[in-house]
A protein has these predicted regions:
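Hydrophobic, secondary-structure "cap" segments at the distal end of domains
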Residues: 151-161
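Glycine-rich beta-to-alpha active-site loop
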Residues: 90, 95-142, 146
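Long amphipathic alpha-helix in the N-terminal Rossmann-like dinucleotide-binding domain
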Residues: 202, 278-287
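Glycine- (often His-adjacent) and acidic-residue-rich active-site loop
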Residues: 56-91, 111, 141-143
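Hydrophobic/aromatic residues within transmembrane alpha-helices
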Residues: 54, 66, 118-119, 178
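Conserved CoA-thioester-binding segment of acyl-CoA-metabolizing enzymes
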Residues: 1-55, 91-94
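Amphipathic alpha-helical segments at domain termini/boundaries
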Residues: 1-19, 24, 120-121, 161, ...
Length: 309
């Protein structure tokens, strides 16, 4: 494994370190996903391992997908291809949270996009109290939606209304607010993160997410025929249309994805998310936003278009 290190302690706690080779930041890539799947399978099958702590070997915890790789595949990518692309990370996150062993995430710095989706798939999250250690799902600003579980885990974790606020704004959240909202379970000085995670594991916590417990239903979702829920959805659609018009599809897709997904068991909900993500990923709007906002900007800043001499 080039991008991940595994250290198994005599106490049964395994430390999984994210440390992408040849990169200054941990990002989601096909090779990284392969490493994660291999690590999860090894941890699941090793009876000596009783709990896992995920940490980062970089200054920050983890960002999202490599945007350059995403743009590179646009020209030939079909919705079917895009769905398959999203399901690779989705399946890895699902394998992590259902492997039968408690997983704590010790975030030493920012966790955005796919990095925060990984954290959401963990059973316990400890975040550095450094104000720069922000968390969030900024995909809407790229014309996309979180494509590996974010639209489903976030509202189940903190509630539909608060979850939608973060998903539709794409804003980053500082540690103190993240704790208040329930995005993380603890905040601590950076040198205490792993100790806090170990303390949690020492309580012998359950390794099952609440949404996987038989009979679970999110309190705020009692079906679209309930007047309050139907009204919230209708108001949300109107607000999105009023703010963004109909030429910017991501906010409306996020809204529909959340309302549809929260009425379903997690695995079916994740499939709904994947279909909406695939539609957006193959839409020219997202392609142009990513190219204009990030790729072209980075090239310009590096002087790619600057005349010689």
């Amino acid at each position: 494994m080039r991008h991940i290190k595994l250290d198994k302690g005599a106490d049964g706690v395994a430390i999984l370190t994210l440390d992408n080779a040849d990169e200054s930041m941990n990002v989601v890539s096909a090779e990284w996903l392969e490493d994660m799947n291999a690590a999860i399978a090894e941890l699941r099958d090793d009876e000596s391992v009783t709990g896992v702590i995920i940490v980062s070997g970089k200054k920050a915890f983890m960002a999202g997908a490599d945007l350059k790789l995403m743009v590179a595949g646009y020209e030939t990518m079909t919705p079917k291809d895009a769905f398959a692309f999203s399901q690779k990370a989705t399946a890895m996150h699902r394998a992590l949270e259902t492997m039968g062993k408690p997983v704590a995430c010790a975030m030493n710095g920012l966790a955005l996009g796919g990095g925060f989706e990984l954290a959401l798939a963990c059973h316990h999250r400890v975040l550095s109290d450094d104000p720069r250690a922000v968390v969030g799902l900024p995909e809407v600003n790229l014309g996309l939606l979180p494509g590996s579980g974010g639209t489903q885990r976030l509202p189940r974790l903190i509630g539909r209304k608060k979850g939608l606020d973060l998903l539709l704004s794409g804003r980053s959240v500082a540690p103190k607010e993240a704790l208040e909202l329930g995005l993380v379970d603890e905040i601590a000085p950076i040198d205490q993160l792993v100790d806090k995670a170990r303390q949690w594991l020492a309580t012998n916590p359950p390794a099952e997410r609440i949404w996987d417990v038989k009979g679970y239903a999110i309190p705020e979702m009692r079906g679209m025929i309930v007047p309050e829920v139907a009204m919230d959805y209708s108001i949300g659609v109107a607000q999105v249309a009023g703010k963004h018009g109909y030429n910017y599809p991501a906010p409306a897709a996020i809204l529909s994805c959340v309302f549809e997904g929260l009425q379903l068991p997690m695995d079916k909900a994740l499939s709904v998310e994947g279909k909406y993500f695939a539609k957006l990923l193959t839409d020219p709007v997202a392609r142009n936003i990513i190219r204009t906002t990030f790729i072209s900007k980075q090239a310009a800043e590096k002087g790619a278009r600057r005349p010689e001499g």
